[in-house]
Amino acid sequence: GHGIGSFLSVHEGPQKIAKNQGLSEGNIKEGMILSNEPGFYKEGEYGIRIENLIIVKRKSQTLLNFEVISWAPIDVDLIEFSLLTYDEIKWINWYHQEVFNKLSDKLNNKEKTWLFKVTQPIS
């Protein structure tokens, strides 16, 4: 993940979390916002990335954790269900329930109907 910008660049630092790309230029600190964007890429064919924004929160005196601050449904039409584990299906269903719970009261009826449809549990 990377820091989020509003005027300079969408990839603003100094914070970042990246495999094989070195350490962050600065410490991760409470209140920082980063992207969380796991993905899969098949070389020369296709790729998919699911991205959310997370904020760094203090969990204890010595431990920080992340809290999702951008909630959007995942397009399940892009998922090959036979490749998912039980825990992955369970997580998608939990995530979609959270999306609906956090957003539905801010939507009009048409929008809420759409959100309800796209956040239905998968199996």
Sequence positions of predicted segments:
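Charged, cofactor-coupling segments
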Residues: 7-123
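Core alpha/beta catalytic barrel or barrel-like domain that forms the active/cofactor pocket
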Residues: 1-7
